[in-house]
Structure formats: C-alpha cells, structure tokens
Amino acid sequence: MSTSLSHGKPDRSPLLAKVLNAHGGLENWERVRSLRADIVLGGPFWSMLGWPPAGLKLTASLDARREHITLGPFTEPDRIAVLDVEPERLSIQTTNGVLVEQRDDPRSSFPPFDPRTTRWDPIQVAYFLSAAHWNYLTQPFSFTYPGVDVREIEPWDEGGQTWRRLAVEFPKTNANHNADQVFYYDTDYMLRRMDYAPEVTANSPVAHYTHDPNTFDGFVFPARRRIHRRGTDGIADQSLAAITLDVARVTVEAELPDRQSDRRRSNRTDPDTRRHPGAAAIDDESTPA
C-alpha cells in the first residue's frame, strides 16, 4: 500500500505555514533523517482485542522520509515489529535479526470489525500501531509530502476556545487510519485534536485529543494523546479514552547544515523537554480539551 515518501512543495496556506513554524520549522525538518520515541500505550481498546493491559512500553524508531518504522519490544522482550514498504510488509523479528513471522500487504488481512468478537493477531496489532505512529510523529511536516492535499476549513468552537482547522487528504500510498482527516489548532498553532475514522475498525469515527506539547531537539510533539469516540455532530464522548498514548522522550537524528555528518540536531545528551508555552494544563485525562 505504501511507497517511499520524500518532501514536496508544501501548501503555503497561512495556517499551515504557521503550524509548521510553530512545530520547529520546515527548513529544519528537511534535515531530519530519523526519530526515536519512547511510548506508553494504554486504554481498554487493546484488552477488547485480546491484548495486554494498560502500561505497555514501546520504543518507536522511524525513518522521517519514508514509511519505515520499528516497534519494540513487541510480544517478547527480544522481539521487534518492522513495517517496511515497496512492497508493504510487516515482520516480527528477534533483536538479532531472526525472522519470526512476516506478512505482505498486512492491511488486507484485517477481519470485519465487531468490538464484541474481533480479535487481532500480532501482525495486525503491529501494523495498526506502526502506521499510526509513523504518521503521528512526522506530522505536521508530512502534510508537505507529495500527494497530500491540505486546505483550511471553517473553525471549530470547543471549551470556550476557537480552533482553526486543516482538512488533510492523504494519498493511497500513505499507510494511515484513513485518507480524509481533520486537524484542529489553537491560537499558538499547537495541535489540539484530530478526527479520523480507521478503516480497520469499520470506520468508527474518533476524536483524538493531544495535550502537553513538549520540545525535543527543537521540534514540538504532544506528550499525551487521548482517543475518544466521536458522534455524528462532531462532539467527542470524553467520559472514556479508548486508547491512551504517552510520549516520554523523542530523539531527533538530523543532518547538520554543512551536510558533513549525521548526528542529533542538538549537541545535548538529553533532549530538550521544556513545556511549550502554548501547552494546556490538563491533569485529568477525562477533562475536555
């Protein structure tokens, strides 16, 4: 399903340009080669599918320029999941490279979704997580990649705030929840919410809220993500987060401006984890964003 992605000419709409600048700048992103993120996964969605309880810790390592990502440990302490492209393939390997299981075109293997009876196998869970996290960690810069259509739509009022919105259509070459998604930004141009409807869960509409934007190696990433059901009126049911994602650390590997060597964008041993000035103080994950 996926092919290599490289940077194209970005949509220069005023909102997208400001969002890119607020998240670290497109010119700086052009030098990024890879990212590594420590993630804690939770929520009742996973146990419903027969998977481990909340608190699963994963490390995601991804190529910033094409959809290639590894997640680990996965299923066993010495195993990792690898999503690659050309052709699209998901494999589970040991950390020393021994193949355990592999599937071409993993997306086509998902069964019809029924929350009461559906169970996913390891390949399917790994694919869902891998495709999601590659997109989460490369956005909003991946909005400038070839084949991605971006336009500003009418604003949205929520919680006494007005959020500007980008409607983004991803190409079929991008492994993602679904093609058409909407992203909501506050007055600091920080992402507050994203709406989509994953094809592999019967296009169930969700509202994915992001909290606590932090700066790591010069780029801004949400530290907390909470995913809720969304009604036909666009209102999210925030009484329960079906999926929770917490990002403890992101390390950005970038090429220096002189192009002489690959190294971190920053010379610091530890990434900059300063709270972004536009971050919302949210102590209860059920509190409306």
Give the ranges of each region predicted by the language model:
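Short structured motifs
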Residues: 22, 149-154, 207-210
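Flexible, processing/modification-adjacent segments and terminal tails
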Residues: 9-14, 94-174, 201, 267
